[in-house]
């Protein structure tokens, strides 16, 4: 596989009064094209900070971030915005939908097509929404009429409608019940099966099991890595035991 993203000596610090809090420390990391990379670690280990730096949502303090062969860490804010629109999709724990728009229009608003209301685009959005369990009746509902799991599904469709090269997710099931969480993970698994590269932060083993690669952060550094087959291609019990064993070794 080819790296779609990689870092060189990546550092990220935050000012804490007169002191500097060093969150990511000289990190060299490759994110492979077509991989489902899961970032795990204890609270405060730098998981979300790393995700934001990789995605161009936050600039590193030092070091380099490459998207393919292109360095992005020195982009202006406007250049980063263009980069994100063209290449990245984002799904967060809290999904922010426009309250005055229904489900269909929320996704259409996020589309970058020149003709946002073209019949072709509307048809594609409707098909994607139906594929994640949001039928035509659901597509007419407004955000205040949706459950957490339903809103998250809208967020995922909105994130993939522009066919991003890489999808970033930060604790996407963190606020969902077990049933809704499983449904959302099934969608991510389907997206990955279609060839989508995914980078996801989680603290949940059930979520991590969906990945093909788990990296473990401690004090801003990668201290371990665990590889897995695509979800569904191996015995789930054995898969869980191996991942649990790896996390135990990491002191999780």
Regions from the language model: what does each represent?
Residues 70-71, 119-137:
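Conserved ABC ATPase "signature" region
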Residues 142-146, 150-152:
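Conserved ABC ATPase signature
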Residues 63-71:
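Conserved ABC transporter NBD signature motif
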Residues 167-170:
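Catalytic Walker B motif of ABC-type/P-loop ATPase nucleotide-binding domains
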Residues 221-246:
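Conserved beta-strand-loop-alpha-helix hinge in the C-terminal portion
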Residues 163:
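Conserved catalytic motifs of ABC-family nucleotide-binding domains
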Residues 55:
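Helix-to-loop junction immediately C-terminal to a conserved catalytic motif
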């Amino acid at each position: 596989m080819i790296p779609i993203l990689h870092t060189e000596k990546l550092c990220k610090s935050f000012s804490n009064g007169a002191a500097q809090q060093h969150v990511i420390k000289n990190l060299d990391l490759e994110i492979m094209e077509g991989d489902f990379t899961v970032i795990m670690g204890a609270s405060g280990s730098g998981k979300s900070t790393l995700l934001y730096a990789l995605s161009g949502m936050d600039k590193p303090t030092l070091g380099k971030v490459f998207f393919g062969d292109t360095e992005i860490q020195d982009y202006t804010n406007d250049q980063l915005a263009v980069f994100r629109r063209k290449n990245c999709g984002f799904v967060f724990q809290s999904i922010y939908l426009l309250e005055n728009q229904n489900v269909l229009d929320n996704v259409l608003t996020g589309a970058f097509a020149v003709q946002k209301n073209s019949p072709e685009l509307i048809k594609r959005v409707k098909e994607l929404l139906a594929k994640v369990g949001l039928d035509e009746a659901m597509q007419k509902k407004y955000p205040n009429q949706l459950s957490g799991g339903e809103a998250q599904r809208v967020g995922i469709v909105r994130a993939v409608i522009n066919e991003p090269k890489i999808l970033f997710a930060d604790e996407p099931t963190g606020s969902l019940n077990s049933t809704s969480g499983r449904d959302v993970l099934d969608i991510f698994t389907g997206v990955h099966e279609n060839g989508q590269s995914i980078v996801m932060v989680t603290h949940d083993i059930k979520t991590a099991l969906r990945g093909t690669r788990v990296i473990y952060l401690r004090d801003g550094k990668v201290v371990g890595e665990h590889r897995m087959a695509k979800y569904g291609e191996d015995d789930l019990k054995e898969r869980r035991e191996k991942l649990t064993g790896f996390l135990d070794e990491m002191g999780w």
